[in-house]
């Protein structure tokens, strides 16, 4: 979301089966005839992603839910679970065409309701937690335009602070990581 780069971060591909199993709730949100974004299961029926991911960049309109599919644990051309989207709830302050910079980033959130729940016991939804404090370390797992077939694990991302209601951290993010 905010491309701050730090060479000290350890970045690795989630290729070890034991390591990848911890992150099966992270997946790709695919748009038919479009792109993709990182998305995360936050309940058996709900996925969190960036709001801009569900808009058509050419028209500025929200894409039809029929064009969206969540692929949990996507790696090497396969997912652990495939789910179509039933409905979309975009953050009320988000405007695809009317915002830029940190104002846009702070409200760039959407919750997608799946048509059917993901009930597998090995795919555990992430809980939504409080924002970590400055100085804390977090991990970021995401896909991006240059690594669309397997997520990357960014370990040791340090929280640098907050600016205009946006968490700023030391990890590199790229298109698709949202």
Language model: regions and residue ranges:
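Short, small/polar residue-rich loop motifs at catalytic or cofactor-binding pockets
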Residues: 33-36, 174-178
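Conserved catalytic-core segment of clan PA serine endopeptidases
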Residues: 8-21, 55, 61-118
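Extracellular/periplasmic catalytic domains that process cell-envelope and extracellular macromolecules
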Residues: 19-22, 41-42, 61-64, 102-106, ...
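Protease-domain processing segments flanking chymotrypsin-fold serine proteases, especially trypsin-like
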Residues: 1-42, 152
């Amino acid at each position: 979301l905010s491309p701050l780069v730090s060479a000290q971060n350890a970045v690795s591909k989630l290729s070890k089966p034991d390591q990848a199993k911890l992150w099966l709730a992270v997946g790709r949100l695919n748009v038919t005839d479009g792109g993709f974004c990182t998305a995360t299961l936050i309940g058996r029926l709900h996925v969190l992603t960036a709001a801009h991911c569900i808009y058509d960049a050419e028209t500025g309109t929200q894409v039809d839910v029929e064009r969206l599919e969540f692929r949990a644990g996507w790696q090497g051309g396969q997912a652990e679970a495939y789910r179509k989207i039933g409905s979309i709830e975009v953050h009320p302050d988000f405007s695809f065409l009317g915002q830029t910079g940190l104002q846009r980033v702070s409200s760039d959130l959407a919750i997608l309701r799946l048509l059917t729940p993901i009930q597998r016991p090995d795919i555990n939804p992430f809980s939504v937690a409080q924002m970590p404090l400055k100085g804390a370390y977090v991990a970021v797992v995401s896909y991006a335009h240059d690594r669309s077939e397997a997520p990357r694990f960014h370990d040791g991302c340090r929280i640098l602070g907050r600016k205009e209601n946006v968490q700023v951290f030391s990890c590199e993010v790229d298109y698709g990581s949202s």
